[in-house]
Amino acid sequence: MYVENSYLSKQLCFLFYVSSKEIIKKYTNYLKEYDLTYTGYIVLMAIENDEKLNIKKLGERVFLDSGTLTPLLKKLEKKDYVVRTREEKDERNLQISLTEQGKAIKSPLAEISVKVFNEFNISEREASDIINNLRNFVSKNFDYSDKK
């Protein structure tokens, strides 16, 4: 177990990096069954069952730009998890929605978070505190809707 009093162990960015990498590794083990990457997983989980979401709004939800989302959405469409349709009023706007298969896997995908949580040596209270602190950190410091 890594607990060290070194320069890196005191760096917020490094601790985020290690945590993110290791958590994603755990998710990846479960996502193989669905032929999904972690990024594909968060995109599917960000789309509500009966929602049509434009690519810009989806990107804001998951902090990804259209250059990253477009190839990912094409892969998800080939797997029959999402469908991409052009908006009638403005064909430049692409609408993303879940297919029946995409809706069907949302429940088992949501259970992955519970499975991953159970692999950690952490209480529900500690997890809740971390989530609240990180949500606060993200909301105070990052706004993906900002123009770059």
UniProtKB/Swiss-Prot annotation:
Primary localisation category: cytoplasm
InterPro entries recorded: HTH_MarR-typ (IPR000835), Transc_reg_Sar_Rot_HTH (IPR055166), WH-like_DNA-bd_sf (IPR036388), WH_DNA-bd_sf (IPR036390)
Keyword set includes Cytoplasm: yes
Gene3D superfamilies assigned: Winged helix-like DNA-binding domain superfamily/Winged helix DNA-binding domain
One term of GO molecular function: DNA-binding transcription factor activity
A Pfam match: Staph_reg_Sar_Rot
Annotated phenotype, changing residue 43 to M: Reduced DNA binding activity and hemolysin production
Consequence recorded when altering residue 67 to E: Reduced DNA binding activity, hemolysin production and virulence in silkworm-infection model
Intracellular or extracellular location(s): Cytoplasm
Coiled-coil ranges per UniProt: none
Gene Ontology BP annotations: regulation of DNA-templated transcription; response to stress
Highest taxon in the source lineage: Bacteria
Annotated ranges, domain HTH marR-type: 9-139
Similarity comment: family membership: Belongs to the SarZ family.
Function: Activates transcription of virulence factors alpha- and beta hemolysin genes (hla and hlb). Also, activates RNAIII expression, a central regulator transcribed from the agr locus.
PANTHER family referenced in this protein's UniProt entry, alphabetically: TRANSCRIPTIONAL REGULATOR, MARR, TRANSCRIPTIONAL REPRESSOR OF EMRAB OPERON
Name of this protein: HTH-type transcriptional regulator SarZ
